[in-house]
């Protein structure tokens, strides 16, 4: 055993025991998440990101984030028909403290899907890959269920295989016609009231009566090259700070968005 001083105990324990604990939230900033102007509620929420330090830029950490929001929140509506639809918004650019988002997909909640599946009926599904006029490649999923005819005395309402094929063909044709003739903004406007599903239900009445027909899911498979002008056009009609910036620029000056309690940095030389 070596005889000598224990340097660790003489200095008062382990190194770094009195290290100052820094709250990680002091290095972060809050940013407002903005939805495109297809929706009534433009202010979706807030998101955190580390402040810009050296080569790590805050806006790079925000781009590509996906936010999932209920349609009821986006439309400021308490209607039950809107609450089970979830829209995905992806952050594409950052302007000041605003994160500008674009449509990234749509889905139904799990509880809604599970509640529709019942006995004594036929479930009919289809999926189509379609391209919009502005070169977005979407995969659209549709779901529907057969319903018992009022005149029928049967307990069940199963469709024949030929009827299922005819219904699926109608679904594919209507989805293709609606999406290929529209750009992404028009497609989203059709998804809000689910007008495509209503057209399918009406068209299939002659084959076999359907109910609970919905566009179950929409995936964005491919996007065109990022265009800032198109994104700003999607966010152009909103009020608030965005409108202030545009009016200020029109008058010859620019309104700069600053956080609360902002103080300009001290200049070393003038």
Swiss-Prot record:
Protein name: Small ribosomal subunit protein eS1
Keyword Cell inner membrane part of the UniProt annotation: no
Recorded family membership: Belongs to the eukaryotic ribosomal protein eS1 family.
GO biological process assignments: translation
Record flagged with keyword Amino-acid biosynthesis: no
Residue ranges of the region described as Disordered: 1-20, 238-270
PANTHER family per UniProt: 40S RIBOSOMAL PROTEIN S3A
GO CC terms in record: cytosolic small ribosomal subunit
GO molecular function, one term: structural constituent of ribosome
Protein source organism: Culex quinquefasciatus
InterPro entries tied to this protein: Ribosomal_eS1, Ribosomal_eS1_CS, Ribosomal_eS1_euk
Quaternary structure, from the entry: Component of the small ribosomal subunit. Mature ribosomes consist of a small (40S) and a large (60S) subunit. The 40S subunit contains about 33 different proteins and 1 molecule of RNA (18S). The 60S subunit contains about 49 different proteins and 3 molecules of RNA (28S, 5.8S and 5S).
Alphabetized UniProt keyword annotations: Cytoplasm, Ribonucleoprotein, Ribosomal protein
Subcellular location field: Cytoplasm
Domain of life: Eukaryota
């Amino acid at each position: 055993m070596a005889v000598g001083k224990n340097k660790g105990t003489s200095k008062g324990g382990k190194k770094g025991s009195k290290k100052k604990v820094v709250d990680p939230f002091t290095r972060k900033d809050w940013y407002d998440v903005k939805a495109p102007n297809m929706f009534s509620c433009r202010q979706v929420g807030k998101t955190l990101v580390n402040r810009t330090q050296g080569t790590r830029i805050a806006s790079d950490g925000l781009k590509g984030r996906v936010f999932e929001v209920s349609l009821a929140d986006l439309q400021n509506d308490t209607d039950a028909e809107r609450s089970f639809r979830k829209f995905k918004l992806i952050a594409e650019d950052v302007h000041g403290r605003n994160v500008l988002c674009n449509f990234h997909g749509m889905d139904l909640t799990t509880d809604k899907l599970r509640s529709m599946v019942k006995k004594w009926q036929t479930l009919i599904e289809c999926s189509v890959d379609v391209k919009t006029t502005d070169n977005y490649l979407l995969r659209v999923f549709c779901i529907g269920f057969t319903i018992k005819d009022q005149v029928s005395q049967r307990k069940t309402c199963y469709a024949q295989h030929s009827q299922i094929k005819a219904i699926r063909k109608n679904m594919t044709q209507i989805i293709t016609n609606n999406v290929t003739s529209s750009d992404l903004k028009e497609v989203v406007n059709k998804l809000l009231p689910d007008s495509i599903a209503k057209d399918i239900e009406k068209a299939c009445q002659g084959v076999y009566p359907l109910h609970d027909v919905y566009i179950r899911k929409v995936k964005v498979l491919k996007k065109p090259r990022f265009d800032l002008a198109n994104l700003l056009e999607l966010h152009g009609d909103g009020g608030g700070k965005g409108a202030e910036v545009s009016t200020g620029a029109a008058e010859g000056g620019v309104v700069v968005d600053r956080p609360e309690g902002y103080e300009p940095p001290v200049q070393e030389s003038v």
